[in-house]
Amino acid sequence: MRADVRVEAGKIAEIGELSVQAGEEVRDAAGLFVLPGFVDIHIHAYAGADCMRGEADVRRMSEGLLKTGVAAFVPTTMSAYPEETNRALLGIQAVKDHPCEHGAAVLGAHMEAPFLCPKYKGAQLEECLCLPTVEAYENMTHGVDCVRMMTLAPELPGALDMVAYLKAHGVVT
């Protein structure tokens, strides 16, 4: 299919047979594919950067991911002590609130732990896992509002109450 694509403010505005407007930049994509940017909703690290290490690493991830076609992403934390998780979330929040000029957008954070069943923890650190409580969650998330996703084990005591709490706060479980 041959078509022109007009991009305004980083978003596709029109597709069809278009006339070039004054001052518009034109790029020839003949023989190429023009696709929307990808969204990665579960990524811990990229190109040597790890979201658990804070803002500088999240910025490196953002800038590197955009070059691969990822337009937006949800940095994913792993099991860690509460203060480490909070530090990681503060870094994610900083990049979400003040995005890189040439980077993939940070849509929020995905907390993959600590509310997991030790039996099914995968690569998560067992000593950092705990039961799902509002107190534990707020201890890790104080000062941030960037959490958008939470992986938690529904079989744990308190899990269903935690799911209701998270849903009320706009967090997908």
Pin down the residues of each PLM region.
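Active-site mouth loops of central-metabolism enzymes
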Residues: M1, H44-A56, G122-C130
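Histidine/acidic residue-rich metal-binding segments in metalloenzymes
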Residues: V95, C130-T173
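Short acidic, glycine/serine/threonine-rich loops at helix termini
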Residues: T85-A88, K119-L125, M162-V163
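Histidine-rich, glycine-flanked metal-binding segment
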Residues: M1-L35
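Metal-dependent catalytic neighborhoods of phosphoester/phosphodiester hydrolases
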Residues: C51, E83-A94
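Divalent metal-dependent hydrolysis catalytic cores, especially in the metallo-beta-lactamase
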Residues: H44, R59-A88, A104-C117, V144-E155, ...
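Divalent metal-coordination and catalytic microenvironments
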Residues: G10, G31, H42, L65, ...
